[in-house]
Amino acid sequence: MTSVVVVGTQWGDEGKGKITDFLSADAEVIARYQGGDNAGHTIVIDGKKFKLHLIPSGIFFPQKISVIGNGVVVNPKSLVKELAYLHDEGVTTDNLRISDRAHVILPYHIQLDQLQEDAKGDNKIGTTIKGIGPAYMDKAARVGIRIADLLDKDIFAERLRINLAEKNRLFEKMYNSTPLDFDAIFEEYYAYGQEIKQYVTDTSVILNDALDAGKRVLFEGAQGVMLDIDQGTYPFVTSSNPVAGGVTIGSGVGPSKINKVVGVCKAYTSRVGDGPFPTELFDEVGERIREVGHEYGTTTGRPRRVGWFDSVVMRHSRRVSGITNLSLNSIDVLSGLDTVKICVAYDLDGKRIDYYPASLEQLKRCKPIYEELPGWQEDITGVRSLDELPENARNYVRRVGELVGVRISTFSVGPGREQTNILESVWASI
């Protein structure tokens, strides 16, 4: 029984797809356990970029099983589109499995997402308008439609009719918006269900059977710990639990079967959307990092906010996710800077604190306390070991590990598979 969980430790976009793809080489099953198509991940294979939103990164290994777990909310329209995209690129999807217990995103979720966000005015939280939140709301309210329901024509029609009647009343009376048509949604989405039917099964059985047989299972999280609905910067968070604990709920695998948790982070910090960001940069350095790091959202295309590495955030993520290993990405983006900074603590009303406050009001008053290190000018994109890094870059990597309190297993100096350097094999250490 061998399993590894990959989680983002910041606000998403840390490079989880790349690291998952890298670790997938030694896994036999790869599974997603939460989120939806609001999260994008980019994988580079032989110099070619593939952008996925729902399907796990392991899909590029045809001999391995890729699982969309019960904790994922699935937009069938997006899924069918993504499958077609992969097929057009010559990628087989015969190895995909979708949980029959996963909940379905429907057009009324997306419309409600947009209306709710618009109604917030200046208090918007920066949702991707993908219907994720409303779908999880229906799930919690026990009125959601699951994949198993989508495949049953009569049950789907019955539940869609009830839900749509309620949502249309809400659209018309509360938001003064246009109601949606039952027949159009039913026809379109039932057809999507039939297209994905071949992939649908009880994925909890597949995952547990694989673990019981001694196979290596990799769990792939979406977003990041700081977007977790419980542990993140609430309410500027997602509607699910990206933390490692979300694996047990979102995949149907018990906590005793989790061996390692790999936290993925960048050598700096980025964030899409609104919400607290203590180390955010608004100067030329921030603009340089954004451009060199190509910091634009995979899903939204929006420019990401960028800032210095925040070890306070990282220690919070380590604690609430039980991180055992760290993967440090995008070190190359910092090349060319005279100095680099790491936030080691916050100043809150004149008091030094080393924890991440829950209160948004306190966070607004937090000022980062920085440790400044000398930068490096060399191009490090061709580096293939820690010893090949310039001394200042090497010191930066070591200092990150010290401040976070977790050993660094891999570091990356570019987006390619070959640019990921192994310091310690995660699989071998289990």
Curated annotation (Swiss-Prot):
Mg(2+) binds at D13, G40. GO terms for biological process: 'de novo' AMP biosynthetic process; IMP metabolic process. PROSITE patterns: ADENYLOSUCCIN_SYN_1 (PS01266), ADENYLOSUCCIN_SYN_2 (PS00513). InterPro entries: Adenylosuccin_syn_GTP-bd, Adenylosuccin_syn_Lys_AS, Adenylosuccinate_synth_dom1, Adenylosuccinate_synth_dom2, Adenylosuccinate_synth_dom3, Adenylosuccinate_synthetase, P-loop_NTPase. CDD domains: AdSS. It is found in: Cytoplasm. Substrate binds at T298, T299, T300, G301, R302, P303, R304. It comes from the Bacteria. Its cofactor is Mg(2+). The keyword Metal-binding applies. It catalyses: IMP + L-aspartate + GTP = N(6)-(1,2-dicarboxyethyl)-AMP + GDP + phosphate + 2 H(+). GTP binds at residues 12-18, 40-42, 304, 330-332, 412-414. IMP binds at D13, E14, G15, K16, N38, A39, G40, H41, T128, R142, Q223, T238, R302. Its EC number is 6.3.4.4. HAMAP family: Adenylosucc_synth (MF_00011). Homodimer. Belongs to the adenylosuccinate synthetase family. This is Adenylosuccinate synthetase. It comes from Streptococcus pyogenes serotype M3 (strain ATCC BAA-595 / MGAS315). The lineage of its organism: Bacteria, Bacillati, Bacillota, Bacilli, Lactobacillales. The gene is purA.
